[in-house]
């Protein structure tokens, strides 16, 4: 088995919670486009903010969030949505893990070959959208 599942939804909707529920029932491994972003800016964040972008608290993440959004957006725009995909693609495909490969942050369908298209058309993956219930 080598099924790839992408989870989409706004920040705080429960994408990682869905991963935790799935991984408790079947062999699953987590992947994230945002982890690639955090790896890329980690040295800068530690030097300028004293924050490890890969292992920060929720409060620290809110401090660096504008930088993450800005940098991530610039890279997406310059590559028509492919920059973070290309960063994660090799790791995902080369990983010999035999179970569900779950990408916990499929967010964009802005460009023709963006994250949703990549998941569905290139990886033959399944997309799950999580909505946060509010009263």
Predicted regions and their residues:
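ATP-dependent NMP and nucleoside kinases share a basic, alpha-helical "lid"
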Residues: 25, 29, 87-135
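ATP-dependent small-molecule kinase phosphotransfer cores
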Residues: 33-101
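Sparse, context-dependent recognition of short Cys/His-centered cofactor- or disulfide-binding micro-motifs
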Residues: 7, 26, 53
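Conserved lysine of the Walker
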Residues: 15
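Post-Walker A alpha-helix
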Residues: 18-19
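Extreme N-terminal starter segment of soluble prokaryotic enzymes
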Residues: 1-5
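P-loop (Walker A) phosphate-binding loop of NTP-binding proteins
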Residues: 10
């Amino acid at each position: 088995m080598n099924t790839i599942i992408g989870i989409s939804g706004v920040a705080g909707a429960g994408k990682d919670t869905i991963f935790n529920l799935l991984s408790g029932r079947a062999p699953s491994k987590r992947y994230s486009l945002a982890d690639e972003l955090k790896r890329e800016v980690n040295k800068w964040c530690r030097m300028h903010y004293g924050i490890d972008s890969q292992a920060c608290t929720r409060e620290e993440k809110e401090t660096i969030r504008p930088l993450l959004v800005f940098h991530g957006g610039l890279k997406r725009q310059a590559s028509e949505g492919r920059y973070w995909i290309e960063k994660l693609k090799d790791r995902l495909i080369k990983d010999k893990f035999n179970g569900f490969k779950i990408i916990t942050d499929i967010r964009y369908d802005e460009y023709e070959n963006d994250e949703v298209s990549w998941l569905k058309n290139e990886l033959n993956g399944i997309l799950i959208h999580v909505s946060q219930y509010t009263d």
